[in-house]
């Protein structure tokens, strides 16, 4: 899956990110995850983010899912943070559209 897979559902407040920003957000996620977190040890590729908060959409190939992660910019010690929701592509499209309608 690539950024192009979700491009058609990226309306405000969502926006696709550059490769450089993706790499930076991928590293930030790694810093934040505790060993108990559902994404720990899995390759995550940032594809989009919200302009009004710290939510980032990551593609998790090993799970064949997208993860919407609310980054905290802090090293976390529990499985609860950063808050993460997993979606299939169809579910992610619905979620992003619902956020855009409320935005």
Q: Model-flagged regions — what are they?
A:
Residues 3, 49-50, 90, 102:
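Arginine residue identity/basic-tract feature
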Residues 29, 33, 37, 48, ...:
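Generic secondary-structure transition motif, activating predominantly at the C-termini of alpha-helices
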Residues 14, 33, 62-73, 99-103:
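Aromatic-enriched hydrophobic runs in primary sequence
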Residues 11-14, 18-21, 52, 93, ...:
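Generic ordered-secondary-structure signal
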Residues 38-83:
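Amphipathic protein-protein interaction modules
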Residues 70-103:
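A short, surface-exposed interaction/processing loop segment used at functional sites
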Residues 2-42:
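Negatively charged, low-complexity tracts enriched in Asp/Glu with abundant Ser/Thr
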């Amino acid at each position: 899956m690539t950024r192009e897979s979700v491009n058609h559902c990226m309306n405000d407040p969502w926006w696709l990110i550059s490769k450089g920003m993706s790499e930076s957000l991928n590293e930030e996620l790694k810093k934040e995850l505790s060993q108990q977190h559902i994404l720990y040890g899995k390759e995550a590729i940032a594809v989009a983010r919200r302009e009004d908060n710290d939510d980032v959409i990551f593609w998790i190939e090993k799970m064949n899912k997208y993860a919407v992660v609310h980054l905290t910019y802090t090293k976390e010690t529990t499985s609860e943070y950063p808050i993460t929701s997993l979606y299939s592509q169809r579910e992610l499209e619905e979620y992003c559209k619902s956020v855009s309608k409320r935005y």
